[in-house]
């Protein structure tokens, strides 16, 4: 089944009409900083860029998406001349905030770039450099939900004693 909701009077904004968007899954795009340390012990680095991603369920039947191929913000920055040459107008980035899966749709901290991708300053630099090439950056911001392994819920205890799961007085608990 399908639900389609739209405004019949909607018009594409002039600023993006006819523009070319290029979607990037940061971890798989380009590794700009090689041999970076893994910031969390449960992450697995795939040095072989042609290796098959882990897709089989683990011993308890879960799919953790914990294998990483090393793509990062500096890698995207390195490819800006190439992307410009291709004629793109916008880069649409899959989630970049700290998370504990390679797809990062289970955000753990909305205030910080995932350390495997770089720093907040690296993101600012990427945006400034992209602008020099006439390329805009659009974030896939998943602000409607977060992961249970996050500073907000903290089910795994990775973020100390705070979080709605561990602290009845948490500001994130309703």
List each model region and its residues:
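Generic structural hydrophobic/aromatic packing signal, biased to beta-strands
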Residues: 3-5, 93, 110
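Short, flexible turn/loop "capping" segments at secondary-structure junctions
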Residues: 14-15, 102
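Extended acidic/polar, glycine-enriched regions
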Residues: 1-14
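Substrate-binding/active-site clefts of carbohydrate-active enzymes
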Residues: 26-89, 96-174
